[in-house]
């Protein structure tokens, strides 16, 4: 039995779960998410808990059991509390700002980079160098944060660029010259 898959999911009071065959719909104060689960797993609701079970013991079912449980748990957590991803901008002259709903990045290019948020995603900027991506769908929050980071990933020599909060960038030593010009 999958150690992750057999753990029950606690549903908060303000969250409503509807199960229709393989489709799971979760509604909460932050929004509504729905997902079609594989036919190898089934979800049952007992009071304030959800239980994900697999139909048989095939290898595919065992693989999808823990995944499906985690996906449903992320849906429940997303509509009740939401998710956020923090990014840090390092480098002279590199900064971010929010204009309307869009994120404007000045990253040393000849133009500003404008990022439009998908539905359900909000941007916030602190001190022009910290970007917060928040929303109720964990997958979309992570993908949006990855797109922002891809605008200027941290480089290994000076560490300039956009990185996730707490990300450690491996640094490289620069060239060791022979002495320089005289």
Curated annotation (Swiss-Prot):
Pfam family, one: Ribosomal_L6
Lineage top rank: taxon: Bacteria
GO annotation terms (biological process): cytoplasmic translation
Keywords, comma-separated and alphabetical: Ribonucleoprotein, Ribosomal protein, RNA-binding, rRNA-binding
InterPro entries listed in its UniProt record: Ribosomal_uL6-like, Ribosomal_uL6-like_a/b-dom_sf, Ribosomal_uL6_a/b-dom, Ribosomal_uL6_bac-type, Ribosomal_uL6_CS
SUPFAM superfamilies: Ribosomal protein L6 (SSF56053)
Molecular function via GO: rRNA binding; structural constituent of ribosome
Gene Ontology CC, one term: cytosolic large ribosomal subunit
Family, as annotated: Belongs to the universal ribosomal protein uL6 family.
Function summary: This protein binds to the 23S rRNA, and is important in its secondary structure. It is located near the subunit interface in the base of the L7/L12 stalk, and near the tRNA binding site of the peptidyltransferase center.
Description of how the protein assembles with itself and partners: Part of the 50S ribosomal subunit.
Protein name: Large ribosomal subunit protein uL6
Organism, scientific name: Trichormus variabilis (strain ATCC 29413 / PCC 7937) (Anabaena variabilis)
Gene: rplF
